């Protein structure tokens, strides 16, 4: 009996030792695993080096080709898919011809000539067909320099970056732009503000409240070099300035080089690419838009994008025609007839004329359509539109009717819901969400999104330190959703163009504008309406997953390269499989890139790709040199 107990004791002891050994080994495995994950999750120092190779004077280095190679990037993988090497060779993209250095794919003059001149259709967006697509890198001009930092950029730009003196000659009297040695200077003048944009805006502020936070978003039609928008920024008003690519060379390019929001666009046959009720203020200073023609169609479009209670400001012909008619080289009768026609259209839209003083005339859109509907019952033209597509604006034809406002029973209520004053507006729950117009979105989810973006921006500052140092002025978010990225960036000296893809499941651009932010619609299978090298940073979350079955991802990346300035930064969020595809493409585009972990850690399937476009410039080809020699002969 004792012998049996002794054997049992030894067996128990052996089991205990074995269990202790297993637990010990397991514990060590877990410890090393956690330590490894923690170590790998720290941000490699080389990521910081990615984004800070800014050349203080690129023109002093070789203008040929490329900046010095950055430090070798450390790639620490936390996903087996990331470890798979591909035997496929990287495709390296060649620079395009130097003559394409200002190429705008969907506003190409040669292509535009094929289209009808009626209602400026030939200057609208007309994108290249398949055999016209470019698979090359748009080159910067030979002596391209990194632009001035904001706020100095408001007043100065390098001549080598936009080598066009036409505006400085053509608009010399109007003080738009001056050439001073190797740079342009922007004195802040304009056709209708000879005392400068600042003084002009002060004149407006004496007539309507500009500084109480009620006016935040503005649209400037036919913007010139965007001095109006540039000086509104001092008043915390964010203007989207637009002008066509036309005889006034590079207006929008100058605006963006200054660090002022702008986009290529025109009042033509289609709606502007913005949702209904987007802007608190619309402005036209001698913008040459025929407001009175086509039954007032263009003013109906202004009415669509104006917020209830928003203002329309007009200066220049025909306003104050009694003083200026001789200088405008038009008859008094002609100018009076034009102004009367504009007054009639404004009245038919149920607008109220606020004032006309000096060179300024201001109208206000009603808060709601309660009274307007009563007027329209008598068949007064134009009617209120019957279709319910007020926010639809991508390649959508203009309509000769008044866009209906959301229903309200109280004549003192703002249709669609009142907005908070700025800056509270940025983080207040937008009325479109309160009213339930965005599927599967409510106030709680909106607030959660704001918290998510606080965490993401904190992470971005670690992997892109320049983000908090004022390095990036012009920023684009290619898939903006609710505008959380832009709202979280408000503390920095930057602005964000929030792009909502027309293919996105939720169309949220109206929400973005209700937050006091700006943006536009876009199909990323096409080119964006901007000049090359106009953005310092591009952000995109989930964009390539959205488009990978719709169009060639290479074309989207080449378009990003066209838009991005040399030494600009790209931050992409997506699943690791998609980012691996993207990184393989960008390695052939003169970009330095690295995939890093999600802010939640290495086990999240979503990763972040950080890339920097290297500095390089175009060079005249032998063919171009020969052509120049022949021209000189």
Swiss-Prot record:
Keyword vocabulary terms for this entry: Endoplasmic reticulum, Glycoprotein, Membrane, Methyltransferase, Signal-anchor, Transferase, Transmembrane, Transmembrane helix
Membrane topology (Lumenal): 40-633
Alphabetical GO biological process terms: methylation
Main location per the UniProt record: endoplasmic reticulum
Annotated Low complexity bias: 59-70
Gene Ontology MF terms in the entry: methyltransferase activity
GO cellular component: cytosol; endoplasmic reticulum membrane
Protein name in the entry: Probable methyltransferase PMT17
